[in-house]
């Protein structure tokens, strides 16, 4: 695909449209020490056309996120209950950048995945969220059809329980096998 191919498929915005007309993206990212993952993810949401972007991250990353991107709504979350009031807000969700295999990430991701599956909210799972999916606690969660997984070869190998070099031999075949 060329840039021109992509550009011609991006819908033009009406002159009288406003941010509320262009979708609400919820991002859950950035465990302790990895606030940049949330910052970069929220910037990407803005740059790719989301009208409203809300970032849920560790409390310690809120100030840096707001300083860098004041147009992003940022909230610090300490546990899964802290995300509940935000779950009905988005049109789409991104989760995983800067998340790890720890209690904070596990409880938040679990609550999120149950909600998006029950409500068919389009969801992109990346990085730490993908690694957590292989945990036994997540085995009963069914991802809905509007879930996109974006693993790099190491994450794909872990998810498929095969060696990275097997992924690298034929990425397309590996993706289809999962």
Question: PLM ranges: what are they?
Answer:
Residues 8-19, 36-39, 127-130, 145:
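Membrane-targeting and insertion segments and their boundary/processing signals
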């Amino acid at each position: 695909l060329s840039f021109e191919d992509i550009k011609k498929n991006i819908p033009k915005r009406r002159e009288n449209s406003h941010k509320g007309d262009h979708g609400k993206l919820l991002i859950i990212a950035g465990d302790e020490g990895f606030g940049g993952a949330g910052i970069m993810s929220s910037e990407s949401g803005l740059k790719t056309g989301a009208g409203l972007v809300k970032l849920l991250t560790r409390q310690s990353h809120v100030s840096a996120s707001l300083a860098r991107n004041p147009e992003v709504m940022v909230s610090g979350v300490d546990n899964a209950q802290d995300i509940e009031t935000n779950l009905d807000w988005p049109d789409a969700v991104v989760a995983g950048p800067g998340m790890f295999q720890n209690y904070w990430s596990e409880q938040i991701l679990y609550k999120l995945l149950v909600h998006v599956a029950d409500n068919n909210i389009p969801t992109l799972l990346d990085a730490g969220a993908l690694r957590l999916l292989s945990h036994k606690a997540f085995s009963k969660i069914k991802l809905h059809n509007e879930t996109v997984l974006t693993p790099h070869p190491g994450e794909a190998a872990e998810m498929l329980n095969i060696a990275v070099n097997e992924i690298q031999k034929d990425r397309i075949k590996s993706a289809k096998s999962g």
